[in-house]
Amino acid sequence: MNLTYKVHPIKTRYQGWTNYCYIIEDIVSRSAIVVDPSWELSKITTTLSELEAELKAVALTHSHYDHVNLVDPLTKMFNAQVYMSKKEIDYYQFRCRNLISLDDHQTISIGNTRAQCLLTPGHTAGGMCYLFSESIFTGDTVFTEGCGICEDDGSSAEEMFDSIQRIKSEVSPHVRVYPGHSFGKSPGHSIKDLYQHNIYFQIDKKEYFVKFRTRKNQKGIFDFK
């Protein structure tokens, strides 16, 4: 299959935080979307410049600060549109320049490249994944090695279970996963790999999932690399 886009992972750091954001470049138009821009603005702008790509949009998986803190400078520099789920916007009263709310199953596009928006609550009330033809950008819903915590306002381990089951049922095994954080594995592993190495993909009963996700004294939950 000839892809219409390229994925450019960017690892960013600030103090104790390590995040992954992603530039998706439409090959023909050289237009770009950035997913969850965080911490190091120069890495994003330098990558765009090297690609000779024009930033058209920012796609946000959720509203936590470590995933949205570069929205303001990027919208000022590029006048880019900003996408976030309507549920997330309404629940947390998120506001920014050029904000566009998205519904479940809605489609966004740049050039010849399209993505389906999947509502995946659990880590937050209105988390959203962006499913391209061969790639899914999952924020803090699914990591290669785990899933997001479900302890903050709007979180729900029950909804996290449902969201992971949805990904398992609706996303093809060959699709590559690009999460917001990593515990050591590089982004871009397939859904099939997660079935083998991610315990949250292996638990099929909601009761067991919730007990395991909410267990006490979990260690290393923010040990991102």
From Swiss-Prot:
GO terms assigned for molecular function: hydrolase activity; metal ion binding
GO terms for biological process, alphabetical: antibiotic biosynthetic process
Compartment(s) where it occurs, according to its Swiss-Prot or TrEMBL record: Cytoplasm
Keyword Ribosomal protein attached: no
Co-factor binding comment: Binds 2 Zn(2+) ions per subunit.
Residues that bind Zn(2+) 1: H62, H64, H123, D140
GO CC terms, sorted: cytoplasm
Main localization category: cytoplasm
Stored InterPro entries: MBL_Glyoxalase_II, Metallo-B-lactamas, RibonucZ/Hydroxyglut_hydro
EC numbers: 3.-.-.-
Claim: RNA-binding is one of the keywords in the record: no
Enzyme class: hydrolase
Pathway the protein contributes to: Antibiotic biosynthesis; bacillaene biosynthesis
Record keywords: Antibiotic biosynthesis, Cytoplasm, Hydrolase, Metal-binding, Zinc
Pfam families, sorted: Lactamase_B
Cofactor: Zn(2+)
Residues annotated as binding Zn(2+) 2: D66, H67, D140, H181
Entry function: Probably involved in some intermediate steps for the synthesis of the antibiotic polyketide bacillaene which is involved in secondary metabolism.
Family per similarity comment: Belongs to the metallo-beta-lactamase superfamily.
Name of the protein in its database record: Probable polyketide biosynthesis zinc-dependent hydrolase PksB
Annotated organism of origin: Bacillus subtilis (strain 168)
